[in-house]
Amino acid sequence: IAAMDMLQGGMSWDEIALLSKAIEAAGASIISTHFTWHESQVPTIATMVPRRAFTGVTKRVRKEVSITVITSNRINMPDVAEAVLVDGDADLVSMARPMLADAELMKKAAEGREHEINTCIACNQACLDHTFAMKTTSCLVNPRACHETMIKWGPASETKCIAVVGAGPAGLAYATVAAERGHAVTLFDAADEVGGQFNLA
C-alpha cells in the first residue's frame, strides 16, 4: 500500500489505516508499504532523501494491524535495515536497488564484511531511468548488474603489478576488478581523498 501518497486530494491517514485493517481482514499475511506515486513528483528514493526517511510512517501502519509489515525506501545498508527493525518501525525491510549495486550484499553482511559492500548511492540513473526508457536495467556503481552473462572476468592467467592513476569512479572500478582478478594494484591520485569528480556531486 501507499502509506503516504503525497497527492493533493489523496488518501488521508484515516483511510490508509482503514485500508490496512481491511487488507488484514481479507486474509493477507503481509502488508508492504511504499511512499508516494510517480505522479506526486516528491522525491522519496533519491540521494537527497535521508536514509530510512519514511519508516516512521510504516510504524504507524504496523500499530494498526497484527500481520507482518514491510518498509522500504532509502534503506541501502545492513546497519540501516537493522536499526529499522530494532526501533520497531517494521517487521521486514525491502531492499532492491542495493542488490543491483552489490549482489553479494546479504552474504557480505552475514559474514561481517559490511565494509566491502558496494553501496547503492540512490542515483536512479541506470536502474529506474533505464527501466522507464525501456532499456536494460543496470547500476552506475556496478556496471555488471543485469549484464553478468556478457561482462565476465575470472582470475588472471598472469598476475601483474598495476599502477592506476586517478581515484575517481573509473579508476576505482578498474582497480577493484584488477585486484579481484589477482593483480597487485597501487592506486594513485593527486587529491587527498578518493572519489574524483564524484565528490562534486
Task: Please state what every model-predicted region is.
Residues I1-V165, P169-V185, E193-N199:
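Flavin-dependent oxidoreductase catalytic cores
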